[in-house]
Amino acid sequence: MRAAAEHLTPVTLELGGKSPCFVDRTADINVAARRIAWGKFTNAGQTCVAPDYVLATPDVAEALAERIAVAITEFYGEDPKASPDFGRIINDRHFERLCKL
């Protein structure tokens, strides 16, 4: 950033974030579940806004977890491995690299 500032160069910092989701009884559980599942699984979860935490009040937590599971099944079917839409690691080299993280 210092080098960019010295030359008035625009800079964008990707700071990441843990992107928590908070769900309580005022939320539409079905909508929240679909959006959480979509956000996490889009691009195999490799986006800066993919939710990493779901915080839910006790009165909705179980229903939300069930609806997220339903949403994942709706998006990718009963067998995600057979779904062309389910993100994958593309080769053994990348798989090994990720295992070392």
Where are these regions (language model features)?
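ALDH superfamily catalytic-core signature
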Residues: 1-101
